[in-house]
Amino acid sequence: MMIKVASITKLENGSIVTPKGFSAIGTVNGLKKEKKDLGAIVCDVPASCAAVYTTNQIQAAPLQVTKDSITAEGKLQAIIVNSGNANACTGMQGLQDAYEMRVLGAEHFGMKENYVAVASTGVIGVPLPMDIIRKGVATLIPTKEESEAYSFSEAILTTDLITKETCYEMIIDGKKVVIAGVAKGSGMIHPNMATMLSFITTDAHIEHNVLQTALSQITNHTFNQITVDGDTSTNDMVIVMASGLSETRPINMEHTDWETFVGALQKVCEDLAKKIAQDGEGATKLIEVNVLGAQTNEEAKKIAKQIVGSSLVKTAIHGEDPNWGRIISSIGQSEVAINPNTIDITLQSISVLKNSEPQTFSEEKMKERLQEDEIVINVYLHLGEETGSAWGCDLSYEYVKINACYRT
């Protein structure tokens, strides 16, 4: 797909409240002691929406309730999110609590119940403290201030070290249209869809079914191509809300600027996916794997994700060890048909394998390059024209420490 890059501009100071019609809030309520733990995004009008969800067969109560909301009309006007408690594996009481959270939001913001989505993230198997939720929702007063957009970003974090935001402006029908996103995710990241939350706002004029098609396709190339530890969560999802307040013609696949919109949505999703991978628990380096010359895009993506998900590759990168043997071993494990005699591998643009034969390289130069924060592995299969990418992070001693002590 050709993306009209000239029509898409990154807004460095933009946020989820930059698109027309959106406001946000994040507050401290006691779910995470003194940290922000409850937030909301609210739209001035019922917004077209789309969502993708975890493929884990154990699905948390908030996710079930949000599915119910979106299925009703394909519209949302508010998203309420808490952190510190996942409300997962909490039985019928957990489901009732999630529905009550939705009712509380509808009553507080004055909107239809099925226009409210709910999300939770945190420890699994602990009942949601509804006394805190009831009091907290009643105090949520969203604003269009950028500072409150940042507060929302903080309110959805768990073991994350940083907030994750991005924003782009595009030109549709000659008018400025904005799309922005926020995400959380640090551990249990192996989406398909899983282990992270992302909320995207836009003032684009686009209907639910068209937006759903775009999001589902883009998710497969972005969020589903990141891995931190190979675990798939019970809670997580991506939701897009489109207010339509940019007042362009309805965007669909026949629209002359369709590729521009899809390109901007992909940039938002890819930015957030990379930020999640880079902020993996205990991570010190972002790893990007690009597979080129594959027979199909799906095969390229499968190999890329196999490599970036390998614990041996991740630990080698953490130790700044150019052990390309672990990379080619991962390629062979991918169950994708390859020619074992035509593989090239570069590590930080330095050739380590050519036609499946080892290459001589400067150890000093390689050591210097592997000390960088972002590591790029390129694999050339020489089988076709298709490419695919995946993102992850190194595996450190700190990851074990964080997860050994998570509940405490």
UniProtKB/Swiss-Prot annotation:
Tell me, in one coarse class, where this protein mainly resides: cytoplasm
Q: Output the SUPFAM superfamilies linked to this UniProt entry.
A: DmpA/ArgJ-like
Task: Check the record and name the InterPro entries matching this protein.
Answer: Arg_biosynth_ArgJ, ArgJ-like_dom_sf, ArgJ_beta_C
State the active site: 195 (nucleophile)
* EC top class, as a word: transferase
Q: Does the keyword Protein biosynthesis apply?
A: no
Any one biological process term the GO annotation gives:
ornithine biosynthetic process
* Reactions mediated catalytically: N(2)-acetyl-L-ornithine + L-glutamate = N-acetyl-L-glutamate + L-ornithine; L-glutamate + acetyl-CoA = N-acetyl-L-glutamate + CoA + H(+)
What EC number(s) are associated with this protein in UniProt? Answer: 2.3.1.35, 2.3.1.1
User: What is its subcellular localisation?
Assistant: Cytoplasm
Q: What GO cellular component entries does it have? A: cytoplasm
Q: In which pathway does it act?
A: Amino-acid biosynthesis; L-arginine biosynthesis; L-ornithine and N-acetyl-L-glutamate from L-glutamate and N(2)-acetyl-L-ornithine (cyclic): step 1/1; Amino-acid biosynthesis; L-arginine biosynthesis; N(2)-acetyl-L-ornithine from L-glutamate: step 1/4
| One Pfam family matching this protein | ArgJ
Coiled-coil ranges (or none): none
Q: Where is this site: Cleavage?
A: 194-195
Q: What's a Gene Ontology MF term here? A: glutamate N-acetyltransferase activity
Q: Where does substrate bind?
A: 158, 184, 195, 281, 403, 408
The keyword Cell division is assigned to this record: no
Keywords per UniProt: Acyltransferase, Amino-acid biosynthesis, Arginine biosynthesis, Autocatalytic cleavage, Cytoplasm, Multifunctional enzyme, Transferase
* Residues with site note (Involved in the stabilization of negative charge on the oxyanion by the formation of the oxyanion hole): 121-122
Purpose of the protein: Catalyzes two activities which are involved in the cyclic version of arginine biosynthesis: the synthesis of N-acetylglutamate from glutamate and acetyl-CoA as the acetyl donor, and of ornithine by transacetylation between N(2)-acetylornithine and glutamate.
Q: Which HAMAP family match?
A: ArgJ (MF_01106)
Q: To which protein family does this belong?
A: Belongs to the ArgJ family.
Its name, as the record gives it, is: Arginine biosynthesis bifunctional protein ArgJ
Species source reads Bacillus cereus (strain ATCC 14579 / DSM 31 / CCUG 7414 / JCM 2152 / NBRC 15305 / NCIMB 9373 / NCTC 2599 / NRRL B-3711)
